[in-house]
Amino acid sequence: MAAKIKSGDLVKVIRGKDRGKEGTVKQVLKDDRLIVEGVQIVKKHVRATQQGQQAGIVAVEAPIHRSNVMVIDPETKQPTRVRIVEKEEARDGKVKTVRVRVAKKSGKELA
C-alpha cells in the first residue's frame, strides 16, 4: 500500500494532548508512527558524552501514531483525508501508470 502521509507534509493533530496543533512531518517511522515538528514534546534526560555534549534535560519530539493526524489540504487549509489515484503519464515515449496522492476535499494533487 502506498504511503498516504510522507515527510514534509503539513498535518494537524486530531487526537491526544496536542489536539489542534499543526506541524510538518519530520520523519515517518516503520511502525505507523510519525515525528511531527513541535508536537508531542517530551523531556529526555541525557548523559554527558566524551565529544563535549553536556548532561541535562532536553526537550525532544516523541512519535505520534498516524491515525491521530490528518493531512492539511493545501487549497482549503483544512484537514482532509488522502486518496491514492492512478493516472497515466507519458514518459520517454511510453505510457506509464503512476500513483498520485490526492486531497479528498478539494481533489487537488498533494506534492
Curated annotation (Swiss-Prot):
Record PANTHER family: MITOCHONDRIAL RIBOSOMAL PROTEIN L24 (PTHR12903)
CDD domains: KOW_RPL26
Biological role stated in the UniProt entry: One of two assembly initiator proteins, it binds directly to the 5'-end of the 23S rRNA, where it nucleates assembly of the 50S subunit. One of the proteins that surrounds the polypeptide exit tunnel on the outside of the subunit.
SMART domains according to UniProt: KOW
Gene: rplX
Protein's UniProt keywords contain rRNA-binding: yes
Oligomeric form and interacting partners: Part of the 50S ribosomal subunit.
Coiled coil: none
Gene Ontology MF: a single term: structural constituent of ribosome
UniProt-listed HAMAP family: Ribosomal_uL24_B
Family as reported in the entry's similarity comment: Belongs to the universal ribosomal protein uL24 family.
InterPro entries: KOW, Rib_uL2_dom2, Ribosomal_uL24, Ribosomal_uL24_CS, Ribosomal_uL24_KOW, Translation_prot_SH3-like_sf
Protein name per UniProt: Large ribosomal subunit protein uL24
Parts of the chain that traverse the membrane: none
GO annotation, cellular component aspect: ribonucleoprotein complex; ribosome
A GO BP entry: translation
Origin: domain of life: Bacteria
Keyword set, alphabetical order: Ribonucleoprotein, Ribosomal protein, RNA-binding, rRNA-binding
